[in-house]
Amino acid sequence: MKQDVLNFIEEHRLFASGGLVIVAVSGGPDSMALLHFLFSHREQLGITVMAAHGNHQLRQEADEEETFVHQFCLSHGILFTSARLPVKERMEMSGEGVQVTARELRYKWLEAEAKKHGAAFIATGHHGDDQIETILMKQVRGTFPLSRGGIPVRREVGDVLIVRPFLGITKGQIEHYCKEVNIEPKRDPSNNASSYTRNRFRHTIIPFIRGENPNAHLHFRRISEWKEEDECFLLDLAENALADVLLHKDEHLVTIDRDAFLNVGLPLQRRMIHLILKYLYTNDSPANGFIHIERIETLIRNDVTGTKLHLPMGITVERVYGQIRWVRASGEKQPVPVYPVVIEGEGQVSTPFGRFCVVQLVSGPRSMSPFTFTCSASDFPLTVRSRRTGDRIVLSVGTKKVSRLFIDKKVEREVRDRWPLVFNQSSEIVSVPGLYNHPSQKHKQDFQVTFTPKDVRLEDYV
């Protein structure tokens, strides 16, 4: 393993300039092995090493892990810094999940520490198995085509370079190294929780791939590196092409010439859309997957002016004659729509939320749409409206507030008021399409109701 890592560092010239390296250390096997390895080879690599531990304060073992890392550094004479990161408080404010919030806080703190101490590098313990997981997860989610690959070997953040020296080795090699140098790392039990997507990939898919080819991580590494190089080249071309079709650009509005855009090759068109979204979402786009880019492409090709598409976080794409506009909604609070609409029975009904199609069933449900539910004749007339304070859904046991349903499903605040609630004639909520159906509906097979949302953002949550 040692020579593999040294060869990887030399091949990618990770520490060519030398200087202080801040190693992100959780106390787990990956980061502890990286800390030990870099400190042991510091003279050969021409670097100085400092350990940085971010205490997320989420588990009882958190303080014990911080003490463990600190004591390890004291016993080896390694520089050490730590901080208590307010993950829970930030989650309550942002509504983001624990992993996303912890990662954002951790990296911001590491970057601040690097600036404070004049560090040239931040090193993390990501390894070859992590690379396989990341690439496969991106492919499954539909975000791989326009990404720059998997986990980058290096990434610039201001004046600091984030580097991953272990991307060329496996988790098994790291575990073996820990035993070899007598490191007994701490283990985070959440790494075994099947509720996290990455863990399901790690414990189910990675062993299968390893069984097929023990060196698969090397091939995935090349895939990521080649993809990054290819994508950088294509994005440069797309930037030049975008400059030629751009009519207006500021933080609230981007306008392009439709005809000029359509004269560009399709691969560059997709990347031009990607660049616009990246700009408007300030590099952190929730709308750069297959579904959003393809829907924007369809809108641009549509011959009907006035067509609109709603994206997450208040961005609207619209065709206005010969122009395509990306518009960011103002920060002003919009009135909550109520829109009570009655559905009497079979047929199609258009609402401000989208279209509802009701058909009578003869031989079981027909639609596979997640926005479909069934009901009986006694449920009609149905009423469709937006949420109101106090609305509740019925569960198998007890009830739940609709507001809590949206929180549990991680639906953004601005989208919640655009989501229809469907009531039966007894004023019970029979469906929040895509998120909830009344427990009794599975026994009611007289009619099938399919909702087609007008706002495509709803599809991101089902």
UniProtKB/Swiss-Prot annotation:
Keywords: ATP-binding, Cytoplasm, Ligase, Nucleotide-binding, tRNA processing. One of its GO terms (biological process) is tRNA modification. Ligates lysine onto the cytidine present at position 34 of the AUA codon-specific tRNA(Ile) that contains the anticodon CAU, in an ATP-dependent manner. Cytidine is converted to lysidine, thus changing the amino acid specificity of the tRNA from methionine to isoleucine. This is tRNA(Ile)-lysidine synthase. The keyword Nucleotide-binding applies. It is found in: Cytoplasm. It comes from the Bacteria. ATP binds at S26, G27, G28, P29, D30, S31. The lineage of its organism: Bacteria, Bacillati, Bacillota, Bacilli, Bacillales. NCBIfam families: lysidine_TilS_C (TIGR02433), lysidine_TilS_N (TIGR02432). It catalyses: cytidine(34) in tRNA(Ile2) + L-lysine + ATP = lysidine(34) in tRNA(Ile2) + AMP + diphosphate + H(+).
